[in-house]
């Protein structure tokens, strides 16, 4: 448990914080080197893909011994200058796969965007309809409260106690005693 907690903390530092800082330094140079920018872009693309697959992978294989440590080592391998892990993983695996499936990915993204837009419009329309309904209910309530009542309506609202009312019987008994 403590090992897993420590490993997650180290992963945050060495997998995200340190690379983000190095990327920041590269971007902020007066004349940033294109190779360095390309390296960090590739790194963050790989990290994004790993983060997506990590949800499934963690559930399936996190029980393996040294899984967290291996994940930490892989992140360090990616950015460590002597290993050039990002370049190797990107050029050997990521780029060929994406290039092969790029058209299919683009088509699916267009479908997802269209569905999301359609769903957003449906929910927006429902919210507008519900808002209108509530607005008119409030308006009706306000107009009912502000219109003066006739004397006949006021008499209807005034309740005349019944003779068999238990409260009246108690009071009647008190008076007769």
UniProtKB/Swiss-Prot annotation:
Pfam families the record matches: TB2_DP1_HVA22
Residue ranges, annotated region (Disordered): 145-165
Basic and acidic residues bias spans: 150-165
InterPro entries cross-referenced by the UniProt entry: TB2_DP1_HVA22
Organism domain of life: Eukaryota
Family: Belongs to the DP1 family.
Protein name as catalogued: Putative HVA22-like protein g
Gene: HVA22G
């Amino acid at each position: 448990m403590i090992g897993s907690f420590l490993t997650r903390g180290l992963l945050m530092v060495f997998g995200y914080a340190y690379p983000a800082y190095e990327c920041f330094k590269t971007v902020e140079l007066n004349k940033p080197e294109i190779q360095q920018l390309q390296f960090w872009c590739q790194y963050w693309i790989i990290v994004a893909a790993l983060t997506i697959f990590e949800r499934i992978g963690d559930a399936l294989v996190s029980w393996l011994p040294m899984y967290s440590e291996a994940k930490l080592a892989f992140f360090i391998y990616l950015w460590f200058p002597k290993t050039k892990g990002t370049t190797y993983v990107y050029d050997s695996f990521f780029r060929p796969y994406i290039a092969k499936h790029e058209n299919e990915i683009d088509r699916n993204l267009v479908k997802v965007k269209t569905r999301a837009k359609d769903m957003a419009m449906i929910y927006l329309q429902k919210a507008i309809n519900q808002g209108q309904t509530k607005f008119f209910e409030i308006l009706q309530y306000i107009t009912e409260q502000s219109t003066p009542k006739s004397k006949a309506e006021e008499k209807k609202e005034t309740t005349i106690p019944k003779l068999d009312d238990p409260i009246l019987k108690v009071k009647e008994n008190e008076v007769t005693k």
